[in-house]
Every structure is written in structure tokens, then in C-alpha cells.
């Protein structure tokens, strides 16, 4: 299964000078979106996954614009989870997703060739700016589970803080989610965004790929290729903009892991070169 992944698009049709680690570039969002879609099409991805924060502000027209552009390209089925910024739109987020044929993974998990694909919904926590994750679970039999979550399930707070960068925070119930997912021995691939930094982490059955933001450096578009029978996961990140002086990247452009004896093991980068070459030829 090949999944094209985008996170933290923060669409604002009327640029407001927003920033997090670096300044947002909403004026280039459409162009970069089209470039990512062209790459996903060339690679023949099976799914395009949006990891939330589609919009920056409570503006339904921003959401409609982004969903319409992604859906109109008709590259592959679309699925999404919501981010904390998307909560500002209330039910509008889910309604617009359904209108454009975009699957809400926390409402509609699905299976693909022995891979269960599911999601975590972001909900408001007991006190602002706290957020809670509601995990959808999965049904049926699977060799591997993909969990899409806007917030990382494995915290990256220490890594990001050590680099002197701002950290966007974790879910209030993050540790509970980690414990629940880690207690089940089935291998799981966690795909997340939110922190605008590219990272990877692994513990027990959990392998987490956190993708960089799309609206600011590293302007990441990502393809994750999963072979559940071989226990193989390839992550290829492509920068669609210039490298910033403050570069929030803690993982290589290409990474490879295999599920071996009940845990995820890194594999030589050389093995990825062949895979990406094969991707370009399909």
C-alpha cells in the first residue's frame, strides 16, 4: 500500500502573516499542492491522507477551497483526520469532507490488503488549549494497522525542545493512547503531524512517522509504502520549497524499517534507493 501524506496545510486565502517555526507561505500553497498531487499520481498511490490542520482560521471558504482542489485532481481516494485548528469550524469540517467524498478515518476505518487503516479524532480537552484524542479502533483481521493522528502518539517534546524550537503540545490523553496501542502486539504505523517537524520514533510495536508541515519549511510531501507481508515500511519525504535557516527536520528524506521479532528495526538507506527507483518507473 502506498499512501501520499500531507499535513498542516493551514490554508488562508487571505494571508495574515501567520507563522509557527517559520513564516507560513499561503500564497504558494496551491502550487505546492499541485506539485504534491503530481508526485502522488506518478507514484500511483493508493490513498492520499490528510493529517489535519487543513485551515488556519475559522473560515469555511478556506476549507472548501482546499478540499475542492484535492478532490478535483482525482489522483486517489482521499481520507483525513481533523487537527486542532480544524475544530474551529465545528461540524463544517465533517460536512465539507463528506461533500467532497473525503473519508473521515475516525468515523470510517477501512481495510486494504491486510492493512487496517484507522484514525484519531481531535476533541477539545477539559480546559483550553488542551485537546483529547478519540481513537476509532479497527475491526476484522489485519497483519498491520495504520493509525492516522494529527497529534503524535509518541511525544516528540524532548527532541524538539532540545533543538530550541517551539513545541505545539501533546494530547491530554497521549500516554493512554500510547499504552492502548502498544499493549496490542500487532505492528502499527502511526502517521502524525501537528508539530511542523519531521521526525521518526519507534517503541515496541509502534513505528511513528511525523511529517513536516506543508505550509512552512520543510514543505513536506511524503509517500509511505507499506508491505504487511514483508513487514516493510518505506518513508520518502520530498521538500517542495527552500530549506530554511531554522530547519525543523530530525529524520532523513528516506527511511526504511522492517518488523523483525516483534519490533521495528531500521534498515540501510541503500534499500530505499531501489524502492524509490521502482516508484518512478510504475
Task: Say what each PLM segment does.
Residues 1-64, 141, 282:
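N-terminal active-site segment of His-dependent metallophosphoesterases
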Residues 1-5, 109-119, 139-146, 202-208:
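Beta-strand-turn-beta hairpins that frame and shape the catalytic cleft
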Residues 8, 48, 53, 66, ...:
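Divalent metal-coordination and catalytic microenvironments
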Residues 10-15, 56-60, 84-92, 108-111, ...:
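Active-site environment of divalent metal-dependent phosphoester hydrolases
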Residues 28, 42-44, 147, 187, ...:
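A structural signal for the main folded, soluble domain(s) of proteins
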Residues 35-47, 125-205, 260-279:
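His/acidic metal-ligating clusters that form di-metal
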Residues 60, 64-137, 180, 223:
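Extended active-site neighborhood of metal-dependent phosphoesterases/phosphodiesterases
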Residues 198-282:
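Binuclear metal-dependent phosphoesterase catalytic core
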Amino acid at each position: 500500500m502506498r499512501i501520499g501524506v500531507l499535513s498542516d496545510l493551514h490554508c488562508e486565502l487571505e494571508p495574515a502573516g501567520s507563522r509557527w517555526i517559520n513564516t507560513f507561505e499561503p500564497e504558494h500553497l496551491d502550487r505546492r499542492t499541485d506539485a504534491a498531487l503530481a508526485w502522488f499520481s506518478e507514484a500511483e498511490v493508493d490513498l492520499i491522507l490528510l493529517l489535519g490542520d487543513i485551515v488556519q482560521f475559522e473560515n469555511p471558504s478556506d476549507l472548501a477551497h482546499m478540499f475542492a482542489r484535492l478532490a478535483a485532481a482525482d489522483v486517489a481516494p482521499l481520507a483525513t483526520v481533523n487537527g486542532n485548528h480544524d475544530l474551529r469550524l465545528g461540524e463544517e469540517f465533517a460536512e465539507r469532507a463528506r461533500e467532497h467524498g473525503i473519508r473521515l478515518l475516525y468515523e470510517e476505518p477501512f481495510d486494504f490488503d491486510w492493512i487496517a487503516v484507522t484514525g484519531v479524532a481531535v476533541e477539545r480537552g477539559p480546559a483550553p488549549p488542551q485537546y483529547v484524542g478519540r481513537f476509532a479502533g479497527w475491526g476484522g483481521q489485519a497483519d498491520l494497522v495504520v493509525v492516522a493522528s494529527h497529534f503524535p502518539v509518541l511525544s516528540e517534546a524532548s527532541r524538539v525542545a532540545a533543538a530550541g524550537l517551539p513545541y505545539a503540545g501533546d494530547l491530554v490523553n497521549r500516554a493512554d493512547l500510547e499504552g492502548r496501542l502498544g499493549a496490542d502486539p500487532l505492528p502499527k504505523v502511526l502517521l502524525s503531524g501537528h508539530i511542523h517537524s519531521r521526525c521518526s520514533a519507534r517503541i515496541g510495536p509502534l513505528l511513528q512517522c511525523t511529517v513536516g508541515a506543508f505550509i512552512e519549511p520543510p514543505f513536506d510531501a511524503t509517500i509511505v509504502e507499506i508491505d504487511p507481508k514483508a513487514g516493510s515500511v518505506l518513508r520518502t519525504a520530498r521538500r517542495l520549497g527552500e530549506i530554511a535557516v531554522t530547519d525543523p527536520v530530525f529524520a532523513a528524506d528516506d527511511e526504511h524499517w522492517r518488523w523483525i521479532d516483534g519490533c521495528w528495526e531500521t534498515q540501510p538507506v541503500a534499500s530505499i534507493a531501489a524502492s524509490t527507483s521502482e516508484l518512478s518507473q510504475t
